[in-house]
Regions:
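Active-site-adjacent segment of SDR/Rossmann-fold oxidoreductases
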Residues: 161, 182-193
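Substrate-binding pocket helix/loop in short-chain dehydrogenase/reductase
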Residues: 86, 111-113, 117-122
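Active-site helix of classical SDR
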Residues: 136, 172
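Residue(s) in the substrate-gating loop at a strand-loop-helix junction
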Residues: 156
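C-terminal helical subdomain
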Residues: 193, 197-198, 205, 213-254
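Conserved glycine-rich Rossmann-like NAD(P)H-binding loop of the short-chain dehydrogenase/reductase
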Residues: 41-55
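Conserved glycine-rich cofactor-binding loop
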Residues: 18, 23-27
Length: 254
C-alpha cells in the first residue's frame, strides 16, 4: 500500500476545483472539507445533519476559503432519484465535479456473525457501499466533464484482510475495494478520471471509539494529521494512479 503522509501540498493545490465530500459534518469528512477548501477548492458539504454542515461552512468562510455549498442528504434513506436530482442541481450550479470523497460510513456492530442482525447488515451495506456506488453513477457525467477528476472511496484494513466479528463493515469495505477496481478499469481509457481507495487507519474519530472503546484516543493521529494523502489524491500529483489502494498513514504497530 502507498502512503503519502509526508506529502507537502502547494498552497493553491486545489485552486478552482469543485469537490464533494460526504459525511462532511464531523470527523475525517470535516477535516477533509477544511483541508480541501484551505487549498483553494470549492467544497460541497454533504451530510444528514444541517447544523453540523453549517458549522463547517462557517469554519471554511472564517478561514477565507472559497464559499462552500451545503447539500443535506441522508445516504441511508436516499434513492436513485435523490442522487439524480442531486446531480441535476450540481450540474446547474457548477457544470462539473473535479473531486468526490466518499467518507460517510456506518460501523454497525462488532459481533459474531451468528448473532448479526440482518436489518442492521442491510443498513451498513446501504450506507457504506450501495449509496456511494449509485451516487457515483449519478455523478459520472459531471466527473467526466472535468479535465482532471478524482474519486476516492474510503476503505479499511478489514476490507483488505477480513477479521473476526467485523461483519457487515468488513464485507462492505471488501465490496468497496472490488468496485474501485471495476470502475477504475472502466474509466481508464478516459485519461481524465481516476478512482482509488483510501484506508484512513487508526484515527481519533467517533467511529474508532465505538470500535475500540478501551483504546487511548490520544495515542491516535487526529483527522487533521492524516490529510496529506487525501490532498495528494484529490490534486494533480496523483494523476496516473487509478484503481489503487492507498493508506492515509503508516500501519499502527502492536
Amino acid at each position: 500500500m502507498t502512503c503519502k503522509i509526508d506529502y507537502q501540498p502547494a498552497a493553491d493545490l486545489l485552486h478552482g476545483r469543485i469537490i464533494l465530500v460526504t459525511g462532511a459534518g464531523d470527523g475525517i469528512g470535516r477535516a477533509a472539507a477544511l483541508a480541501f477548501a484551505g487549498h483553494g477548492a470549492t467544497v460541497i458539504l454533504l451530510g444528514r445533519t444541517i447544523a453540523k454542515l453549517e458549522k463547517v461552512y462557517d469554519e471554511i468562510e472564517a478561514a477565507g476559503g472559497p464559499q462552500p455549498a451545503i447539500f443535506p442528504l441522508n445516504v441511508e434513506g436516499a434513492t436513485l432519484k435523490d442522487y439524480h436530482d442531486m446531480a441535476e442541481t450540481l450540474d446547474k450550479e457548477f457544470g462539473r465535479l473535479d473531486g468526490l470523497l466518499h467518507n460517510a460510513g456506518m460501523l454497525g456492530r462488532i459481533t459474531p456473525f451468528e448473532q448479526y442482525n440482518p436489518e442492521l447488515w442491510e443498513q451498513v451495506m446501504q450506507v457504506n457501499i450501495n449509496g456511494p456506488i449509485w451516487m457515483t453513477q449519478a455523478l459520472l457525467p459531471l466527473l467526466k466533464a472535468s479535465p482532471d477528476a478524482s474519486v476516492v472511496f474510503t476503505s479499511s484494513s478489514v476490507g483488505r484482510r477480513g477479521r473476526a466479528y467485523w461483519g457487515a463493515y468488513a464485507v462492505s469495505k471488501f465490496a468497496t475495494e472490488g468496485f474501485v477496481q471495476v470502475l477504475a478499469d472502466e474509466v481508464e481509457h478516459l485519461g481524465t478520471l481516476r478512482v482509488n481507495s483510501l484506508n484512513p487507519g487508526a484515527t481519533r474519530t467517533a467511529m474508532r471509539k465505538a470500535a475500540y472503546p478501551g483504546e487511548d484516543p490520544l495515542a491516535l493521529r487526529t483527522p487533521e494529521e492524516i490529510m496529506p494523502t487525501y490532498l495528494w489524491l484529490m490534486g494533480p500529483d496523483s494523476q496516473g494512479h487509478n484503481g489503487e489502494p492507498f493508506d492515509a498513514q503508516p500501519p499502527k504497530q502492536g
